[in-house]
Amino acid sequence: MKQIDAHLHVWSGDPAGYPYLPGTPDGIARGDAEFLLELQADAGVDGALIVQPIHHGFDHSYVNDVLEKYPDKFVGMALADPAADDPTAALQVLKDQHGYQGVRINPGLWPAGQSMDGPIGDQLMSFCAETGLVAGFLIEPSHFGQVNALCSRYPETRTIIDHFGSVKPGQTQELKELLALARHPKMHVKVSRFPVSSESEWPYTDMSDTIHGLIDAFGVERLMFATDFPHVVAQCGYARGWQIADHVTPSLTDEQRVWLMGGTVMKLFNAWGN
């Protein structure tokens, strides 16, 4: 069984060579690809989906170089710029020249006064459908209705909701709305960023009911586990971050665990030797 981390970031330790976005705090945590590979080797992790980090903004140079250097280890998800004259132009270049297979859609970057399910969202979803790119949503529960509208208009677009959709334990109505998105057959959910979603300490077992609700609604074949490196290193450590699933879903069958810990993301992105 291959273990694939379905969501993480990498950023350069050389801001002179790969500039950070203005306003990035001084002394940010180490997040380079070589550090990640060391941790993955120790944890028995075979590869990862890299999501373009906000520290580099829309400058994908560092992730481009990482993808080129380690093509068997990593797949890239680009960050869409919804304020660009044509948000799809840069994405097309990243796909064609650097092999990106996904697009992160972050409503927090939308122009003021515009909704994610407006014209820009339509353009991005249509583009993903036409190119085969996977659309990943970094959202909160207040955005579930907009995601539902987009997926209803573009049912052929493969989609992912990151980080449980920011649903926390005890948010029964928000969880109900998240589970309702299972009506879209090509929708997936990342069970990720546990230290932020949880209200308890490692191993964050208060997320168990949420995950089992997702399994019942989506099936484990549409769920994927992720650590959210490098943030997880300071939160609980990479190796312990990878062990979370064994504690919050101890009743998983071997087959279900194969899907959750790598099978789903391997199938969705047709990568890592799938």
Predicted regions and their residues:
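Active-site gating/metal-coordination segments in enzymes
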Residues: 57-142, 149, 190-197, 201
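Mid-to-C-terminal alpha-helical segments outside catalytic/metal-binding sites
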Residues: 1-4, 29-47, 212-213, 218-224, ...
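Divalent metal-dependent hydrolysis catalytic cores, especially in the metallo-beta-lactamase
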Residues: 22-29, 34-57, 73-81, 101-105, ...
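Catalytic pocket-lining loop regions of alpha/beta-barrel enzymes
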Residues: 115-224
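Short, acidic/polar
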Residues: 30-39, 84-95, 173-174
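Conserved, mostly hydrophobic/aromatic
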Residues: 7, 40, 63, 94, ...
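Hydrophobic faces of well-ordered beta-strands that scaffold small-molecule active sites
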Residues: 4-8, 48-51, 75-78, 101-105, ...
